[in-house]
């Protein structure tokens, strides 16, 4: 991929020791450690620019380097592969990212990455508060456990996004932007990610001022573990089933059936993520909420949250493990 994302004005290192690059990245971009192959003299390059609350970084270690991070805590990492490839391992899965692909790390995601010798990335560090604000500004609902994205994406999902990043880099390098302008750009990036990438964010649950909708939503919340019929909801709303569909499309942005399914999935995810919840098995949890086809349940869960329910449960158990002890060795 040949895009101008940060030029020599933002250059920090060229032909540098990888550990020097790593130390700088630890200070500004994200906590991690690196492991170098035996032999050879990798020469790293780094471009970095702070733009309001965003950190923009173009990085190459110049060698096959393994990067391990315990998590970003309060930030998201958007990593775009520009050259070479990068092996990602996480929650029992692995994938070779290549140019045109995008890796998105959530704040509590442990990262185990192995760069190819020619790997070059562009990284955007985005504070979680920016995504929270974008949810609020767009009247979307942020789950109690926080916003989570799937790890793997293709830039084709984000039409025009690479051009937006190029504009942000140009703005950061060539002008002294006002804080309000910087905040505006950060909000656009956050809204674009939430709108076009798979995440657990849904529309605002309630639409205040509509008693019929609020009455139906309250009934759903009180009966999530039961079989809820559309006829019963239409009766509660005092309208026909067709009008009920219109009501949900207007106030929830989806159908009644999808709304109920998503709320069940969100409750299951909250239970699986809660260290104080008594969860004996994912299957039992699915059956408890009326998902009798476990394979279809797992697929719906993954398409909604970007991971399998077993991955959510495993992450809760792994949360306090040392990342270098819990991750597989470098091949």
UniProtKB/Swiss-Prot annotation:
Positions of the DNA-binding region: 231-252, 282-305
Q: Which GO molecular function annotations are given, in alphabetical order?
A: DNA-binding transcription factor activity; sequence-specific DNA binding
Where is this protein found? Cytoplasm
Which InterPro entries is this protein grouped with?
AraC-bd_2, AraC_XylS_family_regulators, Homeodomain-like_sf, HTH-like, HTH_AraC, HTH_AraC-typ_CS
Q: Which PROSITE patterns match?
A: HTH_ARAC_FAMILY_1, HTH_ARAC_FAMILY_2
Q: Where is the HTH araC/xylS-type domain?
A: 214-315
Asked if Transcription is a keyword of the record, the answer is yes
Query: Which keywords label this protein?
Result: Activator, Aromatic hydrocarbons catabolism, Cytoplasm, DNA-binding, Plasmid, Transcription, Transcription regulation
Q: What is this protein called?
A: XylDLEGF operon transcriptional activator 1
């Amino acid at each position: 991929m040949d895009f101008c994302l940060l030029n020599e004005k933002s250059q920090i290192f060229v032909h540098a020791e990888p550990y020097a690059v790593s130390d700088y990245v630890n200070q500004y971009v994200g906590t991690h450690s690196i492991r170098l192959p035996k032999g050879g003299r990798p020469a790293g390059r780094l471009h970095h620019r702070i733009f309001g609350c965003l950190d923009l970084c173009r990085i190459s270690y110049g060698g096959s380097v393994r990067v391990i991070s315990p998590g970003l805590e309060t930030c998201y990492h958007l990593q775009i592969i520009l050259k070479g490839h990068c092996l990602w391992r996480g929650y029992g899965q692995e994938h070779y990212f290549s140019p045109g692909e995008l890796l998105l790390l959530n704040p509590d995601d442990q990262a185990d990455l192995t760069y190819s010798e020619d790997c070059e990335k562009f990284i955007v560090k985005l504070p979680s508060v920016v995504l929270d604000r974008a949810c609020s500004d767009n009247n979307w609902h942020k789950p109690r456990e926080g916003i989570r994205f799937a790890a793997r994406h293709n830039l084709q999902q984000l039409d025009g996004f690479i051009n937006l990043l190029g504009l942000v880099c140009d703005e950061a390098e060539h002008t002294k932007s006002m804080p309000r302008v910087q905040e505006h750009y950060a909000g656009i990036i956050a809204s674009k990610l939430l709108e076009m990438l798979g995440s657990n964010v849904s529309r605002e649950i309630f639409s205040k001022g509509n008693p019929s909708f609020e009455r139906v939503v309250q009934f759903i919340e009180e009966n999530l573990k039961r079989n809820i019929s559309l006829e019963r909801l239409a009766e509660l709303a005092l309208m026909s089933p067709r009008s009920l569909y219109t009501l949900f499309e207007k106030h929830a942005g989806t159908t009644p059936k999808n709304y109920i399914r998503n709320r069940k999935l969100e409750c299951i995810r909250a239970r699986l993520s809660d260290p104080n919840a008594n969860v004996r098995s994912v299957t039992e949890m699915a059956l408890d909420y009326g998902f009798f086809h476990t394979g279809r349940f797992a697929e719906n869960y993954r398409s909604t949250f970007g991971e399998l329910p077993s991955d959510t449960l495993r992450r809760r158990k792994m949360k306090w493990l040392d990342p270098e002890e819990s991750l597989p060795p470098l091949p």
